[in-house]
Amino acid sequence: MNMTRTSFFKVYGNGIVAKTLFLVAFMLCMQTINAQEDLDAKYATELPKAGTVAPDFTLSSLDGNTISLSDFKGKYVVLDFWASWCPDCIRDIPEIQSLYNDFSDKGVVFLGVSFDTDKTRWQTAVEKYDIKYPQCSELKKMREAEVAKLYGVKWIPSLVVVAPDGKVALSTVISQKVRALLSERI
C-alpha cells in the first residue's frame, strides 16, 4: 500500500484535493467489496445450505443423453445454473470457464444447468461462448423447472458446489467464492 500511496501522491501531489481523491477511491473500493458480499445475502438465500444433502436430479443433455447428479458421486461437482438470455450469466462465462480449466483435470466435475426454453438458442450460446463442460436442461423457464425448485434457484447465475459425500459445500452467486473453496479443498 505504501508503494501505491507514494505513487498516487507523486502523481497528484500531497494537497487536500489529492488526499480527498485518495480517500474517495479507497471508499469506493470498499463499497465494491461489501456490495459483492451483499449479493449472496440478497440472491442466494434460498439455495441449499452448506452441509445439506444435494438433491439428485436427472436432466437431458444437449446431445440427447441424460445426466444425473448421482452419476458423479465421490467427486466435487460445480453446478452452474444459467441461461443464454441472462446478461450476468454471459458475463460470468469466462470465470466459470477459467475454473473449469483450472480444476477439471483435478477431478472436479462442472455441469451447466440451463433455464433456456429453446434448445437451438441454448446450443448456439454454448458454441458461441465455447463452453467446454457438460450442459443439461429441462427446457423450461426457471420458475417452472423442477431443478430450480429443488435447489431454490431464484436468481441466475447461481453456483452450487457439491462435495464428494453428496452434501452441499457452497451455494453462491459469486464465482470467486467457488475458486476460493476449490483452491482450499483440492
Where are these regions (language model features)?
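Thiol/disulfide oxidoreductase modules built on the thioredoxin-like
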Residues: 129-131, 138-184
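Active-site acidic short loop of glycosyltransferases
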Residues: 73-75, 105, 131, 153
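Structural microenvironment flanking redox-active thiols in thiol-disulfide oxidoreductases
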Residues: 91-129, 142-149
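N-proximal helix/coil linker or "cap" segments that precede and/or mark the start of modular domains
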Residues: 32-56, 70, 124-127
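Bacterial Sec-dependent N-terminal signal peptides
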Residues: 1-38
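Conserved redox-active cysteine motifs that mediate thiol-disulfide chemistry
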Residues: 73-74, 81-98
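A short beta-strand-turn-helix
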Residues: 57-77
